Amino acid sequence: MAIKSDRWIREMSEKHGMIEPYAENQVRFNAQGEKLISYGVSSYGYDVRCAPEFKVFTNVHSAIVDPKNFDEKSFIDIHSDVCIIPPNSFALARTVEYFRIPRNVLTVCLGKSTYARCGIIVNVTPLEPEWEGHVTLEFSNTTNLPARIYAGEGVAQMLFFESDEVCETSYKDRGGKYQGQTGVTLPKA
């Protein structure tokens, strides 16, 4: 299994729609010249942006977190360019980018160091072969202070690994429950 370069990422995105929308360079400034947390293609990965759509965890209803029976009332919906995550809590969001993963590729997501160095951890499970959709992002605020997440700016990096052989059964073949997801998607048992 080999990690794929910027050339491969560019070709797959431009010719096959692997990443839409696709930024062919590292974007570091907005149209007004203000500094951003970078996004776009890098040497061996793609830095994704967070959409302005968040679900922030709250325990106002004294719910129990149960992945088999998740209570949607545990979240407050926020639509904003900035999301404040309470101390020792978390939020869900989604990428701006829509992904279509090739059958012979596994994609792994890592958080950006800009957030990690502030105690904000991004968690995403691997994007499996032939999975497609907006990626649901989980941000954990590990600090005792409120933490800020910026929509429209880089939050995590996707790494693409191409296998030497094509898998027998892809995520699409299995009818994966998160196939084609749009928006912030809550757990499904």
Swiss-Prot record:
DCTP binds at K112, S113, T114, Y115, A116, R117, T136, L137, E138, Q157, Y171, Q181. The keyword Nucleotide-binding applies. Belongs to the dCTP deaminase family. This is dCTP deaminase. SUPFAM superfamilies: dUTPase-like. It holds the Pfam family DCD. Pathway: Pyrimidine metabolism; dUMP biosynthesis; dUMP from dCTP (dUTP route): step 1/2. The keyword Nucleotide-binding applies. Catalyzes the deamination of dCTP to dUTP. It catalyses: dCTP + H2O + H(+) = dUTP + NH4(+). One of its GO terms (molecular function) is nucleotide binding. Homotrimer. It comes from Acinetobacter baylyi (strain ATCC 33305 / BD413 / ADP1). It is an enzyme of class 3 (hydrolase). GO terms for biological process: dUMP biosynthetic process; dUTP biosynthetic process; nucleobase-containing small molecule interconversion. Its EC number is 3.5.4.13. Keywords: Hydrolase, Nucleotide metabolism, Nucleotide-binding. The active site is at E138 (proton donor/acceptor).
